[in-house]
Curated annotation (Swiss-Prot):
Cellular localization per UniProt: Cytoplasm
One example GO MF annotation: 3-deoxy-manno-octulosonate cytidylyltransferase activity
Keyword Cytoplasm among record annotations: yes
Keyword annotations: Cytoplasm, Lipopolysaccharide biosynthesis, Nucleotidyltransferase, Transferase
A Pfam family that the UniProt record links to this protein: CTP_transf_3
First-level EC class: transferase
Upper lineage: Bacteria, Pseudomonadati, Pseudomonadota, Betaproteobacteria, Burkholderiales
Gene, per the UniProt record: kdsB
InterPro entries named in the record: Cytidylyl_trans (IPR003329), KdsB (IPR004528), Nucleotide-diphossugar_trans (IPR029044)
Cellular component terms (Gene Ontology): cytosol
Chief location: cytoplasm
Record protein name field: 3-deoxy-manno-octulosonate cytidylyltransferase
One GO BP annotation of this record: lipopolysaccharide biosynthetic process
Function: Activates KDO (a required 8-carbon sugar) for incorporation into bacterial lipopolysaccharide in Gram-negative bacteria.
Classification via SUPFAM superfamilies: Nucleotide-diphospho-sugar transferases (SSF53448)
Length: 268
């Protein structure tokens, strides 16, 4: 897959209920948001920008020579924050912007490249994202694991926290009465959505004007707003599950250990 010119933007909010000051959490001597930016710089991104509403995060980025844009504090979502950045940077409508989550310091640079290229290869779509097959029944029935089903052209038909698709002939009442671990996976692959997005800058600027969708509010999945308003989302399916992000102190401990292993394998 050839690389598409793109900009990587990392939204970073300081407020976090489960892990205060999360973007500034230390990972081997540097703030987590800086570690994410370093991973993004290992991709083919022409530019890597942190978008934050906190001066302390912007200052930390600048101390480590990471470009940062200070955005408004009243954005309802990370996508709204990206829309402001697209305007501030004066990006042309056809520019590709990849939203890299600020709490995923272990993200694979190749995944960033591939999602950007996937959007370039689907000119009929405003957004591209990624998914991978689920192999653990517990994940299928976990509402914190978002599922996606695709059409024949690998565009998203629906995202949901519910088991999707519902395997009617496999998950019989007798099977559902048993433990989750004993429920077989259906013949059709169940795909887990990976929270990375590539957007066209023109769509980003339109997004804040789109009314919230009832299904978006019910599922609490922001990407459903775009689909509700008729936008198409191209989905790249990958066999490799990405490393989990950081939401809790326990996650941070796990990621610090994984980072140390990464350094041992690849060097600093």
């Amino acid at each position: 897959m050839s690389h598409a010119p793109f900009i990587a933007v990392i939204p970073a909010r300081l407020a976090s209920t489960r892990l205060p000051n999360k973007p500034l959490a230390d990972i081997d001597g540097k703030p987590m948001v800086v570690r994410v930016a370093e991973r993004a710089h290992q991709s083919s991104a022409a530019r890597v920008v942190v978008a934050t509403d906190a001066a302390s995060v912007a200052d930390a980025c600048m101390q480590h020579h990471v470009e940062a844009v200070l955005t408004r504090a009243d954005h309802a979502s990370g996508t709204d924050r990206l829309a402001e950045v697209a305007t501030v940077l004066g990006l042309p409508d056809d520019a590709i912007v990849v939203n890299v989550q600020g709490d995923e310091p272990l993200i694979a640079p190749t995944l960033i490249d591939n999602v950007a290229a996937h959007l370039r290869d689907h000119p009929d779509c405003a957004i591209a994202t990624a998914a991978h097959p689920i192999h653990d029944p517990a994940d299928v029935f976990n509402p914190n694991v978002v599922k996606v089903v695709l059409d024949a052209a690998d565009r998203a038909l629906l995202f949901s926290r519910a088991p999707l698709p519902w395997a009617r002939d496999t998950w019989t009442p007798a099977v559902m009465a048993g433990s989750v671990a004993e429920r077989p996976l259906p013949a059709m692959p169940v795909l887990r959505h990976i929270g990375i997005y590539a957007y066209r800058a023109g769509f980003l600027r339109r997004f804040p004007q789109l009314a919230a969708a009832p299904i978006e509010q019910t599922e609490q999945l922001e990407q459903l707003r775009a689909m509700w308003h008729g936008e198409r989302i191209a989905v790249l399916t990958t066999d490799d599950a990405p490393a989990a992000g950081v939401d809790t102190p326990e996650d941070l401990t796990r990621v610090r250990a994984a980072w140390a292993e990464l350094l041992a394998q690849d060097g600093p």
